[in-house]
Structure formats: structure tokens, C-alpha cells
Amino acid sequence: MEEREWGARSARAGSPASPPSPRLDVSSYSFDPLLALYAPRLPPIPYPNAPCFNNVAEYESFLKGGRTGRGRARGTGEPASAGTSTGTSTGAGSSSRARRRAAPTPDPERIQRLRRLMVVKEDTDGTAGARRQGPGRSKKAPRNVLTRMPLHEGSPLGELHRCIREGVKVNVHIRTFKGLRGVCTGFLVAFDKFWNMALTDVDETYRKPVLGKAYERDSSLTLTRLFDRLKLQDSSKKEADSKSAVEDSTLSRYSQTSTWKVASVWGRGDTDRSSHRRSRSVPSSLQASAREESRSELSGRTTRTEGSSVGGTFSRATTLSRGQSRKKKRKPKVDYQQVFTRHINQIFIRGENVLLVHLAQ
């Protein structure tokens, strides 16, 4: 504050003819910038057209490049009397503010240099110029999976695009958290750079993942094991079909023999009836004796058959109850090696599950 008051007094005391103080002279070694900032009027500048820079970096770039149009010219105020010092100071302050607010004049050399550095990408058919000349903003071409697929030519993804163009079937090996899951054979429709695929008309051969304790004991699945298991299942199915056909034929034969036995029983009943009719002509005394003998024989037979039937039914009941208890104790056996096949109209396979892709033979 003392320096400020001292600078103000010295400026008021000085006459227009007297030389400026060395502390307010810009070209002097004893120049005091703080005192010049708090002075009531601007100190005289030896070069009135000197450019004004915003910071030191801008000044360094000016020294390196030699550009002269970046700065703003600042004029020097004429010395005024002590009475008109306040008016001149306010006028100089307003003019400096207006100059600071004004935009800097563009440098034509710099603009030409930037234009030379710009690279214009023109299309082969010359449509870029027509787009720029046309009114309004030009529409960008759509960018999606279908437009990016042809850009992978000359790479493994380019071979996938060739399979799409030519309609070649592909085999896609997919995996689970442990190893191989199965093989999908179908026609490729779309893909992306992450190997996500969409297929149609797919035949899948797969095995369900092994869980529980069998996961630790089970060996990793391979293609040979997968298809060998499938062949084994097909052969076992054929054997089961042949066995079922043989059983059907034996059942049909058994049904025919049972019908023949029933017919023979019916024939015996008819013969018994005819013999009964003939026995009516026999005397009553002979008929009574024959009836008593037949009754005694029938009673003996029934007692034997009842005992045997009771024992047989009891033994059968015990065996059935034991068999049922055993069946309840037994757990259903799960075949973890079973291979399944199915047909899918369309399927999406994530790229993280793809192991291998090759052409179907």
C-alpha cells in the first residue's frame, strides 16, 4: 500500500515535461511491475504497435514460429496534465478492455499451412465431391453385422463369409464348463468378430454335462468317444428292436395256441353233454352208484387242490412283496455317457462356447 501511495504521489507531482520515473519505465532495469499496475495512468511504452500475449507459452511459440498476427496492438497515451489524469485513465482502461474482448485477427499463413496438412479422402467413383456439394448433411451408410462381414476377407472370418455366400455346411464344436459338449452341423447365416454365430437347419449331437460325484471320476469327452458312443447306442437300439420283434412273434404264437386250447375245451364240454344225454337210458340204480363215486373223487380232488392253491398263493405273495421291496430300495441308474441327437431350425451360439469350426464333409 505504501508503494502504491508513493507511486500515485510521484505521478501527480510529475509534470508532462519531466521524464518518467525509472521504476515506471519499461525499458529500465529498475522497472517495478507492481508499481506500474497500481499507477493511475499507464506508463509510456516505447513500441506502441507491440503485440500483446496472453501467457509466456504464447510468447515462446511466437518466437519460434515468427507469427506476428496473434497479438493485439496497444497504443501509448499522450502525457496529460494533473487535472485531467482521472479522465484519461478511465478512457485508457475502457479502450484496453474493448481491445481484450475483441477477437484476434486470423493469421492467413497459418490457415494455409493447416489446409495443406488436411487430407481429403475421396472415393473411387467420385461420389464424395457430389455429397459435399449437395445441400444438407449427407447420410452415413448403416454399420451393422451384415455390412461388416464382407470386410474380413483374407482371414479365418473371411472363410466363414465364403461359407455364407456359397451355402456350405459347417461343423461347430461347442463346449461346456468341463470340455467338449457336442457338434452342431448346419448352414451359417451371420457372425461377428467375437465368433458369435447364427445357424439354421442344425443337426446337433451332444452329451449332457456330468454333475455330482461322477464329475470327478469322468474322463474328458472327445470327438472319437462321442461318435463311438453314438454308434454303440445305434447298434444297441437295433438289437432291442430285433428282440422286441421276436417277442411280438412269440406272443402272437402263444395267443394262437391259447385260442386252440379254448376251442378244444369247448369241444370237450359238448362231448360231455352228449354223453350225459346218452346216460339217461341207463337204470337209476347204476346212475346213483356212479354219482356217489364221482362225488367222493371230486371231494378228494378239491381238498388237494385247495391246499396246493393256498400254499402257491402264499409263496407267490411273499415273493412279490420281496421283489417290490427290492425294487423300492434300488435307485434308478443314470447313464452319464448317453449321447443325444436333435434337429433345430435355428440356433445362436455364443463365441465363448466355440471350440472349432470346420467345413462339413
Curated annotation (Swiss-Prot):
Cross-link type Glycyl lysine isopeptide (Lys-Gly) (interchain with G-Cter in SUMO2), residue numbers: 121
Main location per the UniProt record: nucleus
Keywords: Isopeptide bond, Methylation, mRNA processing, Nucleus, Phosphoprotein, Repeat, Ribonucleoprotein, RNA-binding, Ubl conjugation
Stretches for region SM 1: 172-205
Bias type Low complexity, positions: 76-96
Residue list for modification Phosphoserine: 15, 21, 155, 281
Biased composition (Polar residues): 307-323
An example Gene Ontology molecular-function term: U7 snRNA binding
Residues carrying Omega-N-methylarginine: 41
Region (Disordered) residue spans: 1-26, 67-142, 268-335
InterPro entries noted in UniProt: Lsm11, Lsm11_M, LSM_dom_sf, Sm, Sm_dom_euk/arc
Annotated segments matching region SM 2: 344-357
Entry's family note: Belongs to the snRNP Sm proteins family.
Domains (record comment): The C-terminal SM 1 domain is both necessary for the binding to the Sm-binding site of U7 snRNA and U7 snRNP assembly. The N-terminal domain is essential for histone pre-mRNA cleavage. Amino acids 63-82 are sufficient to interact with ZNF473.
Official protein name in the record: U7 snRNA-associated Sm-like protein LSm11
Species, as recorded: Mus musculus (Mouse)
Gene field: Lsm11
